[in-house]
Amino acid sequence: MSKSPDGGISEIETEEEPENLANSLDDSWRGVSMEAIHRNRQPFELENLPPVTAGNLHRVMYQLPIRETPPRPYKSPGKWDSEHVRLPCAPESKYPRENPDGSTTIDFRWEMIERALLQPIKTCEELQAAIISYNTTYRDQWHFRALHQLLDEELDESETRVFFEDLLPRIIRLALRLPDLIQSPVPLLKHHKNASLSLSQQQISCLLANAFLCTFPRRNTLKRKSEYSTFPDINFNRLYQSTGPAVLEKLKCIMHYFRRVCPTERDASNVPTGVVTFVRRSGLPEHLIDWSQSAAPLGDVPLHVDAEGTIEDEGIGLLQVDFANKYLGGGVLGHGCVQEEIRFVICPELLVGKLFTECLRPFEALVMLGAERYSNYTGYAGSFEWSGNFEDSTPRDSSGRRQTAIVAIDALHFAQSHHQYREDLMERELNKAYIGFVHWMVTPPPGVATGNWGCGAFGGDSYLKALLQLMVCAQLGRPLAYYTFGNVEFRDDFHEMWLLFRNDGTTVQQLWSILRSYSRLIKEKSSKEPRENKASKKKLYDFIKEELKKVRDVPGEGASAEAGSSRVAGLGEGKSETSAKSSPELNKQPARPQITITQQSTDLLPAQLSQDNSNSSEDQALLMLSDDEEANAMMEAASLEAKSSVEISNSSTTSKTSSTATKSMGSGGRQLSLLEMLDTHYEKGSASKRPRKSPNCSKAEGSAKSRKEIDVTDKDEKDDIVD
């Protein structure tokens, strides 16, 4: 085996010289080098997004072109409607003010906020009282335990004094500049709409200062019919009420961010000068890839798989994957402290996305470009700790954005692990990764830096998720850097599978066919032994190897596979003359993605895929399920189907069983799909269409928790608006 002239790895003919795939078996990584992942270019040479240009699909909150730093706010008439963020400084924002005699007067919210925050605040109790004064609905419900613990117990007296005498006044001054720094309406990035929003880092710091002080209206209630029930929370009150050591460390990260970006009264030199762009991508299902027809060779994907390192540290210049909750940020403003939450507190500018990003639907993703990192950390989950300042040296692009691109894609939550091998659900994960990884520029796409997406608390199988992401990268012609977070065995297993794909010329369609066969096998086993369902990770790879061996043993199949591997969907035609034998195609130009993005289609999801496909916002609020509920409903439908199959196999002679068999098989003996079964499940009244609390929410940990994870109940909530 030898290196090709373009730096790629030539086709594997023998198992000699394995050090060419890694410098040594002692190295933490396998596959190709990071230089190959970067296509033998400089790490930041390839761009993830085009330059900032204002237009109908891209709202820019600062003046273009940028003539001074930080950029000046763009001015346009304010809006107070359901398509824009309702700002606390808007003249329409009002709130009941309590008078000394016990009566109430409707007052301008911003005036109440100014009066409360401009008073001397010297203790944690006074800070809580100030925040409660313009959130009086929650006087008996908000108890800022974490904030009290941090300021009164965790920090020493000098640190606490500095907070109240220096940092808090700076945060307040920055927050009260909201009318000056945000002078045009902030659009909401809503369901089924492709839209981009660019803000200056200074504007983001102002918005986050307001979130720190809990000033945003209509964002505290938990009622299912509330206006923002499909949006993440943004005010910090839930974080202040949470418990656990990681909560205090997250607060330290956030306070450190404000130390870095809040100007003093006499010095504004620390004000950040860059910008950040948020892009919501929404795709049409009928234009997604037919994975059963993709001839893209899996072995052509340059793969670097590493047991050490992190996505944010080693994935510089690549598209970095956020293992997201569909409510952006997951539990970052609560108890959660896993991959997504950690990324959001070390790069707090990502938090502002929670203000305007509606929860992600199955064929949607959010790309965030330009967020700066401010903190170092150690540990994970309960062992997470803030470990000091981080100076981000990432270069900026021509628009002033740090060249750090992060894509938020949410995986399904599997209460029972065997459900994830269903064809319906594997295809959902493929399409979710596809809409996140697709590249819209004519230049070659940078590689993807990812890892065990949707595993851990969400119950995903890393062995399966790695294959699904490899399939998407093959389809799109993107190199793949995969981090196993210390799992050496999985690193070697995944790398070995990739080598097998290279040797056999295995294509996406061939692997998809094998995965579908495995799905049927698991389904058959679960029908016969519904209580066991021991779908082993290792068994999946063993099954794939056996199926590929069958292909090799059939005369003529090898030639067929070789012919199928002659093209990579998403890559240009022809090979470099100097690298005709190179398997990872590093220098090809990607073709235009095979997916259509629409501006404001109201019918992006077919009826059988969506229970909230109504034009009525009230109906959408009613039918919207939480993270856990949506997954639980799908898994329950899968269980019903499995149960139905058992009844059929038992050949019961009762009329009830006969009816069940008929319904399960449908007309012409066709087996119902999971999504059809789910629809039938709803129609029978077996599951309420009305939103409800998930019985499993309290059992989940980290990002698997519902965004509704709080310390109060819905029945105690009151509307926080009188607008």
UniProtKB/Swiss-Prot annotation:
GO terms for biological process: ATP generation from poly-ADP-D-ribose; Cajal body organization; carbohydrate metabolic process; DNA damage response; female germ-line stem cell population maintenance; heterochromatin formation; maintenance of protein location in nucleus; nucleotide-sugar metabolic process. Disruption phenotype: Progressive neurodegeneration. Knockdown of Parg leads to decreased survival when animals are exposed to stress with either hydrogen peroxide or environmental hypoxia. Keywords: Hydrolase, Phosphoprotein. It comes from the Eukaryota. It is an enzyme of class 3 (hydrolase). Residues 702-718 have a biased composition (Basic and acidic residues). It catalyses: [(1''->2')-ADP-alpha-D-ribose](n) + H2O = [(1''->2')-ADP-alpha-D-ribose](n-1) + ADP-D-ribose. GO terms for molecular function: ADP-ribosylserine hydrolase activity; poly(ADP-ribose) glycohydrolase activity. Residues 577-586, 609-619 have a biased composition (Polar residues). The modification Phosphoserine is found at S24, S28, S579, S582, S583. Residues 1-23, 554-593, 609-723 are annotated as: Disordered. One of its GO terms (cellular component) is nucleus. PANTHER family: POLY ADP-RIBOSE GLYCOHYDROLASE, POLY(ADP-RIBOSE) GLYCOHYDROLASE. Belongs to the poly(ADP-ribose) glycohydrolase family. This is Poly(ADP-ribose) glycohydrolase. It comes from Drosophila melanogaster. The lineage of its organism: Eukaryota, Metazoa, Ecdysozoa, Arthropoda, Hexapoda.
